[in-house]
C-alpha cells in the first residue's frame, strides 16, 4: 500500500512525508467535511469543502528538506470541553481522490482558508452549529468601534482578557500540511480570512485578507505597532483589572464562568459588563494620541484596496481555487469566488 500510494501521489513522495504517515491522512488533514462541491467555468476550477476540520489522532508528519519538522499538539482539555469543533463525518476515499486530482492537475493553485480551519486549535468559527453566532453573539462593527468610546472600551477589555488564551493556540494538522505543500511548490498562493496567525506559525506566509490581531493601528495617523506592546500598556493603565484576569485558572472552566467568559473567533472574550464598564482605560497612539484599533477588518469595513487588488490578481491568474474552512459568506471572500466563476 505504501509504494502504491507513492506512485499515486508522486508529489507527496519521500522526502516530503515520512513513511509513518499514510498519504490519505495528509489530504484528510486538509478536508473540512465530507461533502464537496466543484464548480466549473470555461477555464477555471473551484473546489469547496463544507463543515470543519476534525483533529487527527494520528497526525500528519510532513517534512520538506531544509525545513524543521514542527510537532503539532492536540487541543487542550479545556478547549475540547468547549466543543468548538463542529461535528462532521470523516472524508471518504472519494473525497480524498477529488482533492488529490485538484492539486495534482493544477500548476497555479490558490488556497483560501477561513475560520473552520482553526476550530480544532480551540478557536471557534462563526456560523457552524457550535459557532459564535449560535449563542447570539454579534461581533463589533467598524461603525460601532469608531463612534462609541463605550464600545471601544468593551472591545478592548474583552480582547485583553482573551489574549493569553488566544495566543496559546497551536497550529493544527491542516495548517502544517498546507505549509508543507506550499514549501514543496504545490500551492502557488495562499489567502486567509483568519486573523490568528496560525498559518504563519506553521511556516506559511499567506495574504491576510482581514488583517491580524497581532498588530494595532491608529485610526488617525496610521501608526502601527506590536499587539504585545499594547497589552503591556493596558496592563500598566489597569493594574487591578490585569491582576484579576491573570489570576484566573485557564485550565478550570469554572473560574472562567465566574467572569462570564467565552472565547470568540477574533480573539476577544465575552465577559460580563460589570467587569469592564467602570474605570477601564485604553492606551492612545504614541505619535498623535489618536484612537487605536486592532489591525483587522471589522464587519462593516472594507478590505484595504491594495490587499483586495492582490487577492483578485492571484484569483484571476490561478488555474484552480481551493476553499478550506470557509462558508464564503463575507463579501470579500464571496467576491473572489464569484470572480473565478464568472471568468
Language-model features, listed with the residues they occupy:
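Conserved catalytic core of sirtuin-type NAD+-dependent deacylases
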Residues: 2-343
Amino acid at each position: 500500500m505504501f509504494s502504491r500510494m507513492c506512485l499515486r501521489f508522486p508529489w507527496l513522495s519521500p522526502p516530503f512525508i515520512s513513511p509513518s504517515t499514510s498519504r490519505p491522512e495528509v489530504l484528510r488533514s486538509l478536508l473540512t467535511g465530507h461533502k464537496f462541491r466543484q464548480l466549473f467555468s470555461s477555464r477555471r476550477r473551484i473546489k469547496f469543502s463544507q463543515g470543519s476540520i476534525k483533529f487527527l489522532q494520528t497526525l500528519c508528519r510532513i517534512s520538506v528538506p531544509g525545513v524543521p519538522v514542527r510537532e503539532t499538539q492536540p487541543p487542550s482539555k479545556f478547549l475540547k470541553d468547549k466543543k468548538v469543533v463542529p461535528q462532521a463525518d470523516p472524508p471518504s476515499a472519494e473525497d480524498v481522490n477529488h482533492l488529490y486530482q485538484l492539486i495534482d492537475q493544477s500548476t497555479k493553485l490558490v488556497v483560501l482558508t477561513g475560520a473552520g480551519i482553526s476550530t480544532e486549535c480551540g478557536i471557534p468559527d462563526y456560523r457552524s452549529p457550535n459557532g459564535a453566532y449560535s449563542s447570539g453573539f454579534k461581533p463589533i462593527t467598524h461603525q460601532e468601534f469608531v463612534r462609541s468610546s463605550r464600545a471601544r472600551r468593551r472591545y478592548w477589555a474583552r480582547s485583553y482578557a482573551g489574549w493569553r488564551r488566544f495566543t496559546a493556540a497551536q497550529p493544527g494538522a491542516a495548517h502544517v500540511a498546507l505549509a508543507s505543500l506550499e514549501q514543496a511548490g504545490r500551492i502557488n498562493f495562499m489567502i486567509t480570512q483568519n486573523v490568528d496567525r496560525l498559518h504563519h506559525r506553521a511556516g506559511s506566509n499567506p495574504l491576510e485578507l482581514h488583517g491580524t490581531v497581532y498588530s494595532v493601528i491608529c485610526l488617525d495617523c496610521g501608526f502601527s505597532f506590536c499587539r504585545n506592546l499594547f497589552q503591556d500598556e493596558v496592563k500598566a493603565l489597569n493594574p487591578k483589572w490585569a491582576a484579576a484576569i491573570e489570576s484566573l485558572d485557564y485550565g478550570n472552566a469554572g473560574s472562567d464562568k465566574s467572569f462570564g467568559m467565552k472565547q470568540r473567533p477574533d480573539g476577544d472574550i465575552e465577559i460580563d459588563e460589570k467587569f469592564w464598564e467602570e474605570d477601564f482605560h485604553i492606551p492612545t497612539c504614541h505619535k498623535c494620541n489618536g484612537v487605536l484599533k486592532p489591525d483587522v477588518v471589522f464587519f462593516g469595513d472594507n478590505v484595504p484596496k491594495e490587499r483586495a487588488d492582490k487577492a483578485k490578481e492571484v484569483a484571476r491568474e490561478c488555474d484552480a481555487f481551493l476553499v478550506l474552512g470557509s462558508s464564503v459568506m463575507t463579501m470579500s471572500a464571496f467576491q473572489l469566488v464569484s470572480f473565478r466563476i464568472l471568468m
